[in-house]
Each structure stands twice: as structure tokens, then as C-alpha cells.
């Protein structure tokens, strides 16, 4: 079931002021300001030149790093706070912070980007060109949980769309002998 998310652009990796980032574009109706300073996880696949598919999931487990879209501190955001709520964070500002350590054994520019590429190559066997055939997305790195003292509600990423999927599937599965074919269609994109 599709849910609002941040898809990585085809050439997402860049470095600015010695910080590595992924460029994104948002999918679905999001409130952009809600995506800053929130731990994010990376999910998706790299499709390599030889057709090999490398699945990626980073940030869901406690022992894994998370990612974040940084925001300005209130005392540094005098221009930003003049914007409307809808423009407080612009779409082109939804860039995900992914690292800051430079590659150690090299002289030159974009050493943080080079180090991130090295780490991705070591773990997944991918290169920068492999981002062109990748389908990668950033989502909140939070697990579903009970909400309220009485635990009467569920809080989770994607609940707005997914909350309808479970009862639809349950209804189909609980039909004993349908007069006609029972069907629930659950899709993404």
C-alpha cells in the first residue's frame, strides 16, 4: 500500500559544506515541515548492470543508523519563520543528511561523498552509477505503537492509507462461502 514518502532522485548523492546529503522529491500528500528533525529509514532496491537486485533497508533496527532532514535552529531561522506554514520547508529543502566523515586516504574535493560511496560499495556492492536504476525511498523510522493511556488508537507511519487495507483484507478472508468472487486490491503506484 503506498504511503507518503521521500523518493531519492536518480543522482541523489551530493556534498555541501562537508556534509553528505541525498536529494529527494516527495511522493503523496505530505506536510513538508513534518519531515524535518525526524529519524528516517532508507528502503528500496538497487538494480545492478548485470540484473542483480540488491535490497536495502537501513534505519529500522535499533542498532542501525538513522537519517534526518536538518532544520534551522529557531534563533537562526528569522527568514524561514516569515514564510507561510506551507512554504516553511520547501520541497527542494527536503535533503536527507547521510554523513559527515571524509574519506581518509585521499586529497581533493567531495571527500565525504567519496566516503559514503565507499561504505555503500562495501555493504551493497554498488557504485554511484547504480543510483540511476535504483528505487530508494526515505520513510519515518518509527514502529507502530499504541496511543493514549487506554491504548485505544494506533500511531504509525502510513496509517492514513493503510488503515483501510487491513479491514478490507480481513473482510475478504472472513467470507465463508461468497456468492461471487471476493477481492481486495492493494497496490503501490
Question: Could you tell me what each predicted segment is?
Answer:
Residues 1-189:
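N-terminal hydrophobic/helix-forming segments and targeting peptides
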